[in-house]
Amino acid sequence: MEALSERFSALQDKLMDLYESGLEDLETQIQHWKLLRQEQILLYYARKRGIMRLGYQPVPPLATSEIKAKDAIAIGILLESLQKSKYADEPWTLVETSLETIRSPPVDCFKKGPKTVEVYFDGDPENVMPYTVWSYIYYQTDEDTWEKVEGHVDYTGAYFYEGQLKNYYIKFEADAKRFGTTGMWEVHVNKDTVFTPVTSSTPPVGDASNNAVPEASTTSLSSPQRSPSTNRRYGRKASSPTATTRRQKRQGKETLTRRRKTRSRSRSREQRGGRETQRSSSRGASKSPRRGGRSGGGPLTRSRSRSRSPESVTGGGVAPSEVGASLRSVSRHSSGRLAQLLDAAKDPPVILLRGGANTLKCYRYRFRKKHAGKFYYVSTTWSWIGGHSTDRVGRARMLIAFHSNHEREKCIQEMKLPLGVDWSYGQFDDL
């Protein structure tokens, strides 16, 4: 007990000396997180021995010490990786390497030069939300190297370029739906740079067309410039209520006319189909009518039976019970190209992990050591992008491939995923 208290007191003294030194080099920050990790290890050990207090320090629960120790290990790994980069000689403070700064958006990146951006929802200065954005962002690449880029702000949100990809770490649209009513907002940087919507047809929140965000100019946070639209609240004059009403009436009439024509053609086809069915049944013909329509009089046509078949391709992907079925049986019926592709997707087992990019990288490092020889391949981190832009969609991904389903299930039982990482099953025809 006394020896444990003395060791804990010695750690506290080292931490106090480090805080008082005020050194701003990377080696000091790495040492700081090593001391914090050792502190949590001592607290964890003391709690497990039933010790509730070390000196004047209450001993926290085991789960608290465990989480803080893991955080210290993760930050230490990031700092040691950064120390091998060309940015190791830059000044680094305790705030810039703190857990709160690293876990703030963009997550698991080092950041410098915080600035406050104010967003006025509905153009109302009273309905304002402040956001913290960054002048410089240090992100880790898939090759475990570090790159330094400038942070930017536009009408959509705050972002930085990760290679050629435009990576938004803050988007104002989500909060506009929560705190606004019109779906529009103004972005104020340094009290004088303003970004406002430049179209008069910006749809309100909840409209199906609200996915298209109005184009706006962009500024770099390291050297903000005044937006040319600061003299006006909105980039263009909004359409007058009279013109809008006329346009809506005209569009409504056109839509109504199209619906009537479509309904008339559909009714005509149904009537023809019904007459053919009656003539066919009265003659005792065995041949089904050419057009069954919606009359329901004749036997099922080929198209109808296909659309209602339980094996329809449109029914979705592969059921869990069918996984690996293509290797065990031969198909008894021919199918379309999409069905063949779905049948082919039942082979080598994989696990798909989803989480923060750097969190997955740190986990991959530990996974390869702990599970060596128990898996086939593990991929680098990657992301999906949309069909019409290079913006990343969702969280980062990582794949782990196995030789067999048994090997995969055994790994799932043994692996411990970091907080914020989830997984799902997957199959590939080939690797």
Swiss-Prot record:
InterPro entries: E2/EBNA1_C_sf, Nucleotide-bd_a/b_plait_sf, Papillomavirus_E2_C, PPV_E2_N, Reg_prot_E2, Regulatory_protein_E2_N, Regulatory_protein_E2_N_1, Regulatory_protein_E2_N_2
Designated gene of the protein: E2
Low complexity composition-biased segments: 195-205
Family stated for the protein in its record: Belongs to the papillomaviridae E2 protein family.
Organism: Human papillomavirus 23
Protein known as: Regulatory protein E2
Record has DNA-binding as a keyword: yes
Organism lineage: Viruses, Monodnaviria, Shotokuvirae, Cossaviricota, Papovaviricetes
GO molecular function: DNA binding; DNA-binding transcription factor activity; nucleotide binding
Ranges where the record places region DNA-binding domain: 347-431
